[in-house]
Amino acid sequence: MAACFVCNKKAVYGKSVTFSAERNSRVFKPNLQSVKIRMPDGSTKRVMVCTKCLKAGKVVKAV
């Protein structure tokens, strides 16, 4: 599965619990977006970044 380029966040597995306490497997997926970023050496690269890292300004988008 895909992971965030910055924080390496990826899908995790858990259970969904119904009102009658039945448990079903499910997947919690991060909100990954494909963005073109500027690398430290000045080049650009298209990577998958989670929205939490985008909002925090941990990457510089290439325009």
Swiss-Prot record:
Biological process, per Gene Ontology: translation
Q: Which Pfam families match?
A: Ribosomal_L28 (PF00830)
> Which InterPro entries does the entry mention?
Bacterial_rp_bL28, Ribosomal_bL28, Ribosomal_bL28/bL31-like_sf, Ribosomal_bL28_bact-type, Ribosomal_bL28_sf
Cite the entry's keywords alphabetically.
Answer: Ribonucleoprotein, Ribosomal protein
One term under GO cellular component = ribonucleoprotein complex
Record-linked Gene3D superfamilies? Ribosomal protein L28/L24
GO terms, molecular function: structural constituent of ribosome
Entry keyword annotation includes Ribosomal protein: yes
Its family remark reads: Belongs to the bacterial ribosomal protein bL28 family.
Q: Which NCBIfam families match?
A: L28
Give the PANTHER family listed for this entry: 50S RIBOSOMAL PROTEIN L28, LARGE RIBOSOMAL SUBUNIT PROTEIN BL28A
Q: Any idea what this protein is called?
A: Large ribosomal subunit protein bL28
What organism does the UniProt record list as the source?
Hydrogenobaculum sp. (strain Y04AAS1)
